[in-house]
Amino acid sequence: MARYTGPAWKLSRRLGISLSGTGKELEKRPYAPGPHGPNQRKKLSEYGLQLQEKQKLRHMYGMTERQFRRTFDQAGKMPGKHGENFMILLEARLDNLVYRMGLARTRRAARQLVNHGHIMVDGARVDIPSYRVKPGQTISVREKSRNLAVIKEAMEVNNFVPEYLTFDADKLEATFTRHAERAELPAEINEALIVEFYSR
C-alpha cells in the first residue's frame, strides 16, 4: 500500500486525530469530511475500531503498510509488551526524531528534510527516513542546510523537546539518549487494538 500523499487536514478529520501535531484541523470541524456533516459518524464494529486505530498510527508516522507491518513484526520479537515496543520503535525513526527536535513543523516536512540529505547521524549524512536511531547517536543538520527557511520557521514555533533527546539549539544537534517510555508517547493511541488487528 502506497504512502498517503493527499490533503493531510481531510485525512485528520476522517481519522479524528491531528496528523500535523497542531490540532488546527479539528478545531472548526471535528468530524469526518463529507456532505452529511457532524451527524455522519456511525458506530464501528470491533474490526472497524481496530482498523481505525491502526490507520491512525500508520498515518501519524507517515508510513506505508509494508513498513508499518515490518516494524510491528520486529517489535514482536522483543521482550516486553508487543504494542509498547512497537510504538517505541516507531518513535526511534529518524524522520520522527527530526520532528521531535523541532526542526520541522510536521513529520511530513521532517521526512523531506531527511530525503533531501539535510540530516546527519553521527556526522554522516543519512537520507533514509525510516533509519532507526540508536541510543547514544547524535542527529544534526548539515552545515550548508542550517539556514533553510523551513528549519528556521519550525524553530520559531516548536519549543518542546522530549526528555529522551538532549538538544543544542545553537548547533541544531541532538543526542538520542534513550528510547522513549510509553507515557511519553501519543496517549490518544490504543496500541492494544493494533495488536488485536494483526493477530486476527
Curated annotation (Swiss-Prot):
Function field: One of the primary rRNA binding proteins, it binds directly to 16S rRNA where it nucleates assembly of the body of the 30S subunit.
Quaternary assembly: Part of the 30S ribosomal subunit. Contacts protein S5. The interaction surface between S4 and S5 is involved in control of translational fidelity.
Keyword annotations: Ribonucleoprotein, Ribosomal protein, RNA-binding, rRNA-binding
GO biological process: ribosomal small subunit biogenesis; translation
GO cellular component, one term: small ribosomal subunit
SUPFAM superfamilies for the chain: Alpha-L RNA-binding motif (SSF55174)
PROSITE patterns from the UniProt entry: RIBOSOMAL_S4, S4
Organism listed in the record: Bacillus cytotoxicus (strain DSM 22905 / CIP 110041 / 391-98 / NVH 391-98)
HAMAP family: Ribosomal_uS4_B
Region named Disordered: 22-42
Family per similarity comment: Belongs to the universal ribosomal protein uS4 family.
Disulphide linkage map: none
Protein name: Small ribosomal subunit protein uS4
Domain of life: Bacteria
SMART domains in UniProt: Ribosomal_S4, S4
GO MF term (any one): structural constituent of ribosome
RNA-binding listed as a keyword: yes
